């Protein structure tokens, strides 16, 4: 099982502003915050990977087509949760790449939305159930 993922970002304060309200919608809660790092853990003691954000010391820009992180996908319990996340990121001004929809090219059921965070990282909320 994956223990944690660390991601460098150019502006940790902006990351806290963006990810603070988003992560509870993805079933994550704050783990810790310092001057140089911000971390979230699976909510309510669930097992899963922790997510750490660090202040980048070099800004080379980000592209998901280059070697490195392509995107992060968060599994949520229901399709309604996918829709809730979609509404939140739209209201936060995120660029939505794909609104909530079925993805028949992936093993079903696969219902997801994709968007970009303020730093250009592609994120996904996905539900692997038929239930709303």
What role is predicted for each listed range?
Residues 1-16, 72, 129-132:
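N-terminal beta-strand motif that seeds the catalytic metal site of vicinal oxygen chelate
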Residues 8-52:
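Core segments of cupin and vicinal oxygen chelate
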Residues 9-14, 73-113, 118:
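Vicinal oxygen chelate
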Residues 41-77, 83-84, 91:
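Long, continuous compositionally biased terminal/linker segments
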Residues 50, 122-125:
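Short glycine-/small-residue motifs
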Residues 107, 114, 126-132:
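Short beta->alpha transition motifs characteristic of CBS
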């Amino acid at each position: 099982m994956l223990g944690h993922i660390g991601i460098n970002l150019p502006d940790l304060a902006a990351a806290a502003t963006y990810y603070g309200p988003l992560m509870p919608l993805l079933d994550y809660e704050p783990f810790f915050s310092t001057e140089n790092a911000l971390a979230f853990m699976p909510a309510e003691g669930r097992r899963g990977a922790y997510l750490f954000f660090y202040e980048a010391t070099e800004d080379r820009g980000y592209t998901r087509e280059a070697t490195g992180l392509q995107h992060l996908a968060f599994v949520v319990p229901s399709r309604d949760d996918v829709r809730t996340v979609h509404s939140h990121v739209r209201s936060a001004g995120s660029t939505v790449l794909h609104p909530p929809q079925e993805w028949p090219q992936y093993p079903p059921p696969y219902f997801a939305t994709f968007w970009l965070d303020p730093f250009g990282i592609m994120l996904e909320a996905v539900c692997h159930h038929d239930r709303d």
